[in-house]
C-alpha cells in the first residue's frame, strides 16, 4: 500500500505511539520524537493547542500531538486532563477509590489530537469520546488508567482487551479515525 504521508507524532509515551501506529495502519508513516512540551493547566482543547503550537515551533514543520482525559460524572468531569497527575500520585486503585463512594461510576474517556502543518499554520483538533464505567482495577494489558475503564457495551476493561480489541473501540481510535479522514481528504 502506498504511504500517504509521513507524520511526526510528538510523544514520550511508547504505548500511545504503538496505539497510533496500529490504528492508522500502513497508510501513514508515523515517526516519533519526545520533546519536553509545556503542559499548561486548562481545558483539553487549550492543552492540545498549546502543545501543538510549541511542537511546531521546535520542529519547524508538521506535527501531531495528543492529550487524553478521564472524567467522572459524579465529579463533574474530574480528573479530566489532569488524570496523568492523579495517576502518578494515587495509581489506578486510587483513581477507582476516588469515585467508589459515589452512586454512579459513569465516566467518559477522551482523546484529542492536534495536527498542524507547521508554525503559524492552523491547528486542527480531532476528538474521540467514549462512555463507560470506572471499575476496580482489572487486567494487565495496557497502561495508565486502562485497568479501571470499562467501555459501555463491553465486559472488559481496556487492560483486559487485546491491543487489537482496544484499538478498534477506544477513545483514541475514534479520534484517530477523524484524523485519518482529514489527512486523506487533504491528499485528494
Swiss-Prot record:
| Recorded GO MF terms | dITP diphosphatase activity; ITP diphosphatase activity; metal ion binding; nucleoside triphosphate diphosphatase activity; nucleotide binding; XTP diphosphatase activity
Q: Which Pfam families match?
A: Ham1p_like
Q: Which residues form the signal peptide?
A: none
Provide the top EC class. hydrolase
What GO CC terms are in its UniProt record?
cytoplasm; cytosol; nucleus
Q: Could you state one GO biological process linked to this protein?
A: deoxyribonucleoside triphosphate catabolic process
Concerning CDD domains, the annotation shows: HAM1
According to its UniProt record, the EC number is 3.6.1.66
What's its catalytic activity? ITP + H2O = IMP + diphosphate + H(+); dITP + H2O = dIMP + diphosphate + H(+); XTP + H2O = XMP + diphosphate + H(+)
What does the subunit comment say? Answer: Homodimer.
Question: What is the documented function of this protein?
Answer: Pyrophosphatase that hydrolyzes non-canonical purine nucleotides such as inosine triphosphate (ITP), deoxyinosine triphosphate (dITP) or xanthosine 5'-triphosphate (XTP) to their respective monophosphate derivatives. The enzyme does not distinguish between the deoxy- and ribose forms. Probably excludes non-canonical purines from RNA and DNA precursor pools, thus preventing their incorporation into RNA and DNA and avoiding chromosomal lesions.
Enumerate the HAMAP family for this protein: HAM1_NTPase
User: What protein am I looking at?
Assistant: Inosine triphosphate pyrophosphatase
Amino acid at each position: 500500500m502506498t504511504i500517504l504521508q509521513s507524520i511526526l507524532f510528538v510523544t514520550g509515551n511508547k504505548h500511545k505511539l504503538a496505539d497510533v501506529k496500529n490504528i492508522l495502519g500502513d497508510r501513514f508513516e508515523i515517526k516519533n520524537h519526545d520533546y519536553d512540551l509545556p503542559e499548561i493547566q486548562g481545558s483539553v482543547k487549550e492543552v492540545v493547542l498549546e502543545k501543538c503550537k510549541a511542537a511546531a515551533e521546535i520542529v519547524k514543520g508538521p506535527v501531531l500531538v495528543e492529550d487524553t482525559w478521564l472524567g467522572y460524572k459524579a465529579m463533574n468531569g474530574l480528573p479530566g486532563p489532569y488524570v496523568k497527575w492523579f495517576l502518578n500520585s494515587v495509581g489506578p486503585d486510587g483513581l477507582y477509590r476516588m469515585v467508589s463512594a459515589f452512586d454512579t461510576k459513569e465516566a467518559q474517556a477522551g482523546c484529542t489530537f492536534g495536527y498542524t502543518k507547521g508554525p503559524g499554520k492552523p491547528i486542527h483538533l480531532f476528538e474521540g469520546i467514549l462512555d463507560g464505567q470506572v471499575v476496580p482495577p482489572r487486567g494487565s494489558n495496557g497502561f495508565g488508567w486502562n485497568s479501571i475503564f470499562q467501555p459501555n457495551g463491553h465486559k472488559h476493561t481496556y487492560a483486559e482487551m487485546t491491543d487489537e480489541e482496544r484499538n478498534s473501540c477506544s477513545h483514541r481510535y475514534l479520534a484517530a479515525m477523524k484524523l485519518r479522514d482529514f489527512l486523506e481528504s487533504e491528499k485528494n
